Each structure stands twice: as structure tokens, then as C-alpha cells.
Amino acid sequence: MAEQLTIALGFRQSFFYRPALSDASQARGAFRAKARVSSRTRQAARASSLIGTEVYHWVRAHFSLPALDVPDLSNETPQMAVQLLRSMWNLGTRPAPNLVQLCESRGISVAGLGLEDLLEETHEPVDAFSLWDDGRPYIFTARRRSPEGERFTLAHELGRLVMHPNDPTTPEAESKADAFAAEFLIPHTACFEYLPYNPSLERLLEFKTAFRVSAIAAARRVHEVGRCSDWHYTELNRILTLRGFRSAEPGGRTFYERSRVFDTIAGNEKYSLHDMATELGLPTELARSFALQTRLSVV
């Protein structure tokens, strides 16, 4: 049977003889998807998270990772939660740095979804999800979006971890996580600090590049905080749409933010991603997917 499963699924036979995977809580998984996800999709994502947590168990057994520094901000509004977190993490109002490495530096485990093909078969694509397991926070991301969109996804999941650590996915929780992400990536004070009222398109594009967000998101945020008029916002959107920013990000970032944890493993002489795949019984490509060794697709 193990040999048949090995052939069918591509896993090494050793995977099927490993001890049962520790069961990450179903209730604590917060899903970011285009629509309400079905039980089948949740099960597929849960299977991915079980393997993902095992990947990090292996990492912790061979490497020293940063200590946990993630506060419980469940009683705060999104704006206040961001202000507190940015202060605790010494970010001020500056553009947020590499979010994968920022999360890793605070003890949050970030990994790819891994079982993308299985999730694709459910016809309910999941962008990302987060959970707490055994006192440790995890973010799993599919990297389906642009690099700028991926930063919003990570900020959204960070918001879920600090504001709703034990709550299931609800429209209200998702809305608050979106508000958290917008404020975390583009603090309202930064809009007043770095931009004039009714900024020109050129200034807006400089701003969005500095803060590593999409032009559409930057325009929306500037309007939300009252830094431009309704008419000016409409005009900015019209021009951005004409220039193709509604469906893509012309001149945007051409690479995803890299993981310091997995890049360290990839360049390590003693332990490698191949060693990780072998010891865990995983297909090499699946291990690379969990390790965020992905590239932008050409479309």
C-alpha cells in the first residue's frame, strides 16, 4: 500500500511510516479566500497546515529561530492595534520592510501552502490562512497575487493573529483584518507626512513604490484618510485604470519577498532543503513549495 501511495502521490515511502502528525486545531484556522470555503477546502488546507507545522518542527530541531514576540491585541480597534504593534516593533510610520522576514523575526512561522494542486481541485482557491498551534503562530500563503498583493495578504493574516487569535473566520473578522492590513502597510499618519493634499499621479506612484503597495491600494488609502477629494480620487482611478493598474501593476515589483529562515537552510552546508524533504518523506518540489522557493509566473 505504501508503495502504491508513493507512486500515486509522489511522497517518499518513509512519509507513510512516520508517527501521526499532530492535529492543528480546525477552529483556529483563519482562511483568506474569495468566498466562503467549503468543508472539503478546509480539510485540504488543514492537511497542508499539518505538513507545514511538521516542516517547522524539523527547522526548529536543526536551527535556532527568534523568540516569540506577538502581542494579544484582541481588544483593540484595527487602527490602534497597528499603532501599538508598529510601536512595539519599532517601525514608526516608515514603510514596512520585508513582511516575511519581519514576521519571522518576531517568531511567526511563514510557509507556502504546499498542497496547491489539492486546493485547486476544490475550485475554491485559498490565498492564505493563519493559525495558532501549540502556542506558536503560523501563516501559510499560496502566493497567488502580485508581490504587492502578497504583502497585503501577509499583513491581513498578521492582523488575524494579533486581533482574532482564537476566532473562526467571519465577515466582521475579515473586515477588521483588511482594515488592519491597510493601516499597517500605509499608516494614516504617513499619508499626511509624505503626501500633499490631492497628490499628483507622479507623487502617488512614488509613494506606492516606497511603501511597496499597489497603486490602486495607495489611491484608495489616500482617499480613505481624507488626503484627497472625491473628485480627485475618481480622476486618479480613471487614469490608473487607463494605464492598466486595475488588472496588473505596471512597473511593479518583479519578485516575492524572500524568507530568511528558508534561505538560510538553502545555503547551509550541514542541512539542506533536500535533507528536510528526505527526513520528512516529502517530494522535493513540495518541500520547496513549503519553503517559499517560488517564482512569479509568466502570463
Where are these regions (language model features)?
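Active-site hotspot residues in diverse enzymes, especially metal/ion-binding acidic/histidine motifs
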Residues: 1-299
